[in-house]
Amino acid sequence: MARQKLSMDGNTAAAHVSYAFTEVAGIYPITPSSPMADYVDQWSASGKNILGKPALNIFGTPVKVMEMQSEAGAAGTVHGSLAAGAMTTTYTASQGLLLMIPNMYKIAGELLPCVFHVSARCVASHALNI
């Protein structure tokens, strides 16, 4: 079987790789990380990945995507699903990461392994709100 090669941007590549290792994705769309969450949500809903094959993670199941009302809600979802034992991830940008800090302290304190996919964008120092 020949390998299939695709040319893609960084958001697509990160989403493709993260999908394989994720059971639950807690998302809130925020530019410039929105495409990563959108791809994961699209693949989970349609049942097909970027290659047109069944969209299953390494556990043989589709990713459960939970879109929340804010970045803080997405971080809470990540914390809760990690505590329940699920392999969990989220996608955010630098400014949204600030809203996740309280939950990140809880996640770190409980030694729960997870991945936060953070796309590059500077944190606004003149206004620490979104």
Model-derived regions: residue spans:
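Thiamine diphosphate
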Residues: 1-130
